[in-house]
């Protein structure tokens, strides 16, 4: 029997098990559960699961409220491939995830009903559940943004969660920014008076995590185009200045911009037209980026003649690139409800994957609504631990924070009541 083998040999055998199958290993027997949770085994196992073939990237996909692990290989001498590794199901209970945010191996998952948030390390199978102080109404879900970040201090890495809503009501810019500290287990309202708008969460457009901070595409308050990015610094707990994107969206007649993280601490920006002119896109990559400065370099431009019978897919929900191979894996094209995964490159290279996506959707079950588009991002497993709430008596919120919270809840309760009344008046009477 395998249990009679030496411990070192069992460790070597089990370390070859894929990340998505480790839950089965832990449930097999008590000794395997103990072994697989030891730090020595985790270091051995993560070394194997993070090793990849040349041109291979691990990818997390959000499809119809479920998360999946994929492998994408982008090579020059062979056709690219997309391999389904399995559904990520480390959570003890089945939940429906409407948004996901990736931060260095940790996943911030927003549930469908927006009543709970879970921060999750799929590799360590560690979670921390967080209850928002205030539950917003379903019709403003796309105006709520989330980000996970951290600051480095003497005791190590301190995780923080940013949650904010930008809402235009009767031509007024209403916002509420709050931050959750994992160490204190407290929410705090931030003093933010924005002169900008951050790109909304349509089709799961998310911020990009880089070195503990988060970057979003943004525009000036009285501007039409999203021509900037803006950084939230989790150490100083404040937004930086608007930083220029390399392409002026309006002047170059681009309608949409999407950002993504690139290996080695870079951000990529993808500019594209809408469906009316699907023949052109540009991708730029940062050469230097900090909270208050940025510089860019053009990575790839696709410009196809309309009579070639090839259209650049309109991309929803993220992308990732292989900088060396000059290839881009372009998330999902969801035209007419048909989800396809696309890879493009230099010299008109184009490859579309369809069947594998349909297989995933069939397994996923429930089809997502408007608050859950498809989303893709690169992923590297991490040994970072998620700190549990301190035991004992919880710290009390300050009187000033209680006042700020009461003021914001009164404002949004009033807005939602007025909006609900308007909706009722618009409904036809029978």
Swiss-Prot record:
It holds the Pfam family FBA_1. Keywords: Kelch repeat, Repeat. Kelch repeats lie at residues 161-207, 312-363, 383-430. InterPro entries: F-box-assoc_dom_typ1, F-box-assoc_interact_dom, F-box-like_dom_sf, F-box_dom, Gal_Oxase/kelch_b-propeller, SCF_F-box_component. PROSITE patterns: FBOX. Disulfide bonds: none annotated. Residues 1-44 form the F-box domain. NCBIfam families: F_box_assoc_1. This is F-box/kelch-repeat protein At4g33290. It comes from Arabidopsis thaliana (Mouse-ear cress). The lineage of its organism: Eukaryota, Viridiplantae, Streptophyta, Embryophyta, Tracheophyta.
């Amino acid at each position: 029997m395998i249990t009679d083998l030496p411990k070192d040999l069992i460790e070597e055998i089990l370390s070859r098990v894929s990340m998505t199958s480790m839950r089965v290993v832990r449930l097999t027997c008590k000794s395997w559960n103990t072994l697989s949770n030891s730090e020595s085994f985790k270091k051995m196992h993560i070394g194997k699961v993070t090793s990849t073939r040349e041109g291979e990237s691990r990818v997390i996909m959000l499809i119809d409220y479920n998360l999946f692990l994929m492998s994408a290989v982008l090579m020059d001498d062979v056709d690219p491939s997309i391999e389904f590794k399995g559904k990520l199901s480390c959570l003890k209970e089945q939940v429906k995830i409407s948004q996901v945010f990736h931060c260095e191996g940790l996943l911030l998952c927003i549930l469908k009903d927006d009543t709970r948030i879970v921060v999750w390390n799929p590799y360590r199978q560690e979670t921390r559940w967080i209850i928002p102080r205030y539950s917003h109404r379903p019709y403003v879900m796309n105006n709520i943004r989330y980000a996970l970040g951290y600051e480095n201090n003497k005791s190590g890495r301190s995780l923080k969660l940013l949650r904010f809503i930008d809402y235009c009501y009767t031509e007024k810019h209403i916002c509420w920014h709050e931050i959750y500290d994992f160490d204190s287990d407290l929410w705090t309202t931030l003093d933010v008076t924005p002169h900008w708008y951050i790109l909304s969460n349509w089709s799961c457009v998310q911020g990009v995590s880089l070195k503990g901070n988060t970057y979003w595409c943004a525009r000036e308050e009285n501007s039409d185009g999203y021509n900037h990015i803006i950084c939230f610094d989790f150490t100083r707990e404040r937004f930086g200045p608007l930083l220029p994107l390399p392409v002026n969206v309006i002047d170059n007649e681009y309608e949409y911009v999407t950002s993504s993280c690139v290996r080695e601490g870079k951000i990529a920006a993808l500019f594209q037209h809408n469906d009316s002119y699907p023949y052109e896109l540009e991708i730029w990559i940062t050469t230097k980026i900090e909270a208050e400065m940025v510089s860019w370099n053009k990575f790839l431009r696709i410009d196809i003649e309309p009579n070639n019978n090839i259209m650049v897919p309109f991309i929803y929900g993220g992308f990732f690139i292989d900088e060396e191979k000059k290839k881009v894996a372009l998330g999902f094209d969801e035209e007419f409800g048909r989800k396809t995964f696309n890879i493009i490159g230099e010299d008109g290279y184009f490859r579309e994957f369809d069947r594998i996506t349909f297989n995933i959707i069939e397994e996923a079950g429930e089809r997502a609504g408007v608050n859950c588009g498809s989303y893709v991002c690169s992923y590297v497993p991490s040994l970072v631990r998620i700190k549990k709430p301190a035991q004992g008596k919880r710290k009390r919120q300050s009187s000033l924070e209680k006042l700020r919270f009461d003021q914001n809840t009164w404002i949004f309760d009033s807005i939602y009541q007025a909006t609900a009344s308007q909706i009722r008046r618009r409904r036809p009477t029978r």
